[in-house]
């Protein structure tokens, strides 16, 4: 039986991406990033949606070319319906619907957060994917949550941030340090040359599995303001140690709750997903727990950590196999609950 060929389209934030999947195998995964947001210290929604309009056709054409297929071979089109920036989502949704009509191919809506988690089932991402049930720490600039994954489309959020996401905390603290946006990768890189024990910052005291990252941001801000009064060059002179200390603090907060959830539920299958899953300290903490706690860990390839269409195509493939299609009246939504099947 010939494998289905599915196009995935991702446009939830500031990356325009398209991918082709056949079965569980990714044939192409193309992305256009938007450097324009760096000078503003964050994503500007209006600029993002305009850039998507410019990028979406060349990105899709390139993904088809790289996959070495013809456009009429596409069996279905998967697109990110949400959550995300509404203007950005509308570009991808509208184009997906138009292309589906043109090709007379079925349309498949995809939840962006589910896609991050289910990227672990891409063939080249993980030859041995997680076994159900598993826990997935999903961490990005917009979301931080512990998800109990019972089946492909049966997921339960058992813990989440009550304020800032972990990636957002990295970016806001990076702004305090006068680092470029996005600050997370820069903090990670500078941490390699710093001492993680040089400075200590407050940790939240929350019951259960929920997170809070607004406290560490405030703690760092007050600490820096105090030190700059004594030495205006304090940040510049201590940037590596500051980055290493902040990174250690944030990763410890993330791992403490994840360890508690895994212990309470008796689950050893543990995955991470989302942009912050590229962080070297988080990956190292997972590897240490593999040895210390006997976890079976699942760490995504770097190309599947940030927003990408390969993960959208993967979910679309799973829904295609189930015959779960969307109709042309489907609209983008900025809020889209994770456990919506």
UniProtKB/Swiss-Prot annotation:
Binding site for Fe cation: 112, 116, 307
Subcellular compartments: Cytoplasm
Cofactor(s) annotated in UniProt: Fe(2+)
Entry note: cofactor: Binds 1 Fe(2+) ion per subunit.
Signal peptide: none
Binding site for substrate: 138-142, 171, 184, 188, 279
Catalytic activity from the UniProt record: L-threonylcarbamoyladenylate + adenosine(37) in tRNA = N(6)-L-threonylcarbamoyladenosine(37) in tRNA + AMP + H(+)
Keywords: Acyltransferase, Cytoplasm, Iron, Metal-binding, Transferase, tRNA processing
Primary site of residence: cytoplasm
GO cellular component: cytoplasm
Enzyme Commission code(s) on record: 2.3.1.234
Keyword Amino-acid biosynthesis listed: no
Keyword Kinase listed: no
Biological process per Gene Ontology, one example term: tRNA threonylcarbamoyladenosine modification
InterPro entries xref list: ATPase_NBD, Gcp-like_dom, KAE1/TsaD, TsaD
GO molecular function: iron ion binding; N(6)-L-threonylcarbamoyladenine synthase activity
Function as written in the Swiss-Prot or TrEMBL entry: Required for the formation of a threonylcarbamoyl group on adenosine at position 37 (t(6)A37) in tRNAs that read codons beginning with adenine. Is involved in the transfer of the threonylcarbamoyl moiety of threonylcarbamoyl-AMP (TC-AMP) to the N6 group of A37, together with TsaE and TsaB. TsaD likely plays a direct catalytic role in this reaction.
Family named by the database record: Belongs to the KAE1 / TsaD family.
PANTHER family the record matches: TRNA N6-ADENOSINE THREONYLCARBAMOYLTRANSFERASE (PTHR11735), TRNA N6-ADENOSINE THREONYLCARBAMOYLTRANSFERASE, MITOCHONDRIAL (PTHR11735:SF6)
Protein name, entry field: tRNA N6-adenosine threonylcarbamoyltransferase
Species name: Riemerella anatipestifer (Moraxella anatipestifer)
């Amino acid at each position: 039986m010939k494998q289905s060929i599915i196009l995935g389209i991702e446009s939830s934030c500031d990356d325009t991406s398209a991918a082709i999947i056949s079965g569980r195998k990714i044939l192409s995964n193309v992305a256009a990033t938007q450097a324009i947001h760096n000078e503003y210290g964050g994503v500007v929604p209006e600029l993002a949606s305009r850039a998507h309009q410019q990028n979406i056709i060349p990105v899709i054409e390139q993904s088809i070319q790289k996959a070495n297929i013809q456009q009429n071979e596409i069996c279905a089109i998967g697109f990110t319906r949400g959550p995300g920036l509404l203007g950005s989502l509308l570009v991808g949704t509208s184009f997906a619907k138009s292309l589906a009509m043109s090709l007379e191919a079925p349309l498949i809506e995809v939840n962006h957060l589910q896609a991050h988690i289910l990227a672990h089932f891409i063939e080249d991402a993980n030859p041995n994917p997680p076994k159900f049930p598993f826990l997935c720490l999903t961490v990005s600039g917009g979301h931080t949550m512990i998800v109990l994954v019972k089946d492909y489309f049966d997921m339960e959020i058992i813990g989440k941030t009550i304020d800032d996401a972990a990636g957002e905390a990295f970016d806001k603290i990076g702004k305090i340090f006068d680092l470029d946006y996005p600050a997370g990768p820069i903090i990670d890189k500078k941490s390699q040359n710093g001492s993680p024990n040089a400075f200590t910052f407050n940790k939240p005291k929350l019951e259960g599995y929920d997170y809070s990252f607004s406290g560490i941001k405030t703690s760092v801000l007050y600490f820096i303001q105090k030190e700059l009064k004594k030495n205006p060059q304090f940040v510049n002179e201590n940037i590596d140690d500051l980055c290493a200390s902040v990174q250690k603090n944030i990763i410890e907060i993330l791992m403490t709750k994840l360890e508690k959830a895994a212990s309470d539920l008796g689950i050893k299958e543990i995955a991470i997903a989302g942009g912050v899953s590229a962080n070297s300290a988080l990956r190292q903490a997972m590897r240490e727990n593999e040895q210390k706690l006997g976890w079976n860990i699942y760490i995504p390839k770097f190309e599947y950590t940030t927003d990408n269409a390969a993960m959208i195509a993967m979910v679309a493939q799973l829904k295609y196999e189930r015959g779960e299609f969307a109709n042309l009246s489907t609209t983008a939504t900025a809020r889209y609950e994770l456990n919506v099947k």
